[in-house]
Amino acid sequence: MRLILLGAPGAGKGTQANFIKEKFGIPQISTGDMLRAAVKAGSPLGVEAKGYMDAGKLVPDALIIGLVKERLKDADCANGYLFDGFPRTIAQADAMKDAGVAIDYVLEIDVPFSEIVERMSGRRTHPASGRTYHVKFNPPKVEGKDDVTGEPLIQRDDDKEETVKKRLEVYEAQTKPLITYYGDWAQRGEENGLKAPQYRKISGLGTVDEIRERAFDALK
C-alpha cells in the first residue's frame, strides 16, 4: 500500500493517517521529520539541506526528492508508505514521478472550507496541559474555562479565523491543483513505465469512525 493523502488543513488527514498506517502496517512519511533526521545524522543530503535551512531558505524540491528516495529504502517501507503533506505542489508531484516513486492510491478527504473554518476557529486550548475543547463540538463545562483547573482557555493564533482562511487560500492556490493532477493521471494510465495511481475521494464529514470506514472501503 503506497499512498498519498490529500485534503485541506483541518480536513482530518492526521487522524485518518494514523488509522491507515496501523491497518496496513506502513510508515507515515513526513518531509519535516525526514529533513530533521537527515540533518541530525549528518548525511550528505542532510548537510546540504541544513545549509538552506540555516539561511532561512526553502529546501529545493530536488533535494527533498533525494531524501524521499533514501527514506523509501528503509526496511519499514517494504510493505508501502503513506505520504501526508507531500507533495504540496505540481512541481513536487512531477519530481516524484520523474524519480520513479511508485504510488498505488491517492486518497482525498473532502471537507467544505466553511466547515473547516468552523472546526478550526472553534478550538480552545488550556495552555498548561494542552487539553483542547471546541465551542460547538466539545465545549468545556464552564464557557472559556478548563474543566480540570478552571483556568482560562485561549484561542491559538493558528486557530484564529483570519489565519485559517489564509492557510486555506495557500492550499487552494498550491495544493488543490494536485487533485486535478492525480485525477487526470489516473484516467490516462501508465506513463514512462510508472503505473498510474488509483484516485479515491471520500467525504470528511461525519464521525471519526464513519470517515475511517469510508477510507478503508476506498482502499480495498
From Swiss-Prot:
**Descriptive protein name:** Adenylate kinase
- Presence of keyword ATP-binding: yes
- GO BP annotation list: AMP salvage
Pathway per its UniProt entry is: Purine metabolism; AMP biosynthesis via salvage pathway; AMP from ADP: step 1/1
Is ATP-binding included in the keywords of this UniProt record? yes
Instruction: Give the originating organism.
Output: Burkholderia ambifaria (strain ATCC BAA-244 / DSM 16087 / CCUG 44356 / LMG 19182 / AMMD)
As for subcellular location, the record says: Cytoplasm
What does the entry's domain section say? Consists of three domains, a large central CORE domain and two small peripheral domains, NMPbind and LID, which undergo movements during catalysis. The LID domain closes over the site of phosphoryl transfer upon ATP binding. Assembling and dissambling the active center during each catalytic cycle provides an effective means to prevent ATP hydrolysis.
Instruction: Give GO terms: molecular function aspect only.
Output: adenylate kinase activity; ATP binding
- Chief location bin: cytoplasm
Region of interest called LID, as start-end residue ranges on this chain: 122-159
Q: Which residues bind AMP?
A: 31, 36, 57-59, 85-88, 92, 156, 167
Residue ranges of the region described as NMP: 30-59
Question: Which terms are listed as keywords in the entry?
Answer: ATP-binding, Cytoplasm, Kinase, Nucleotide biosynthesis, Nucleotide-binding, Transferase
Name the top EC class.
Answer: transferase
Q: Which domain of life is it from?
A: Bacteria
Name the catalysed reactions.
Answer: AMP + ATP = 2 ADP
Task: Give the family from UniProt.
Answer: Belongs to the adenylate kinase family.
Annotated function: Catalyzes the reversible transfer of the terminal phosphate group between ATP and AMP. Plays an important role in cellular energy homeostasis and in adenine nucleotide metabolism.
Q: Which InterPro entries match?
A: Adenyl_kin_sub, Adenylat/UMP-CMP_kin, Adenylat_kinase_CS, Adenylate_kinase_lid-dom, P-loop_NTPase
List residues binding ATP. 10-15, 123, 132-133, 206
Q: Which SUPFAM superfamilies match?
A: P-loop containing nucleoside triphosphate hydrolases
Q: Which GO terms describe its cellular component?
A: cytoplasm
Subunit-level organization: Monomer.
Query: EC number(s) on record?
Result: 2.7.4.3
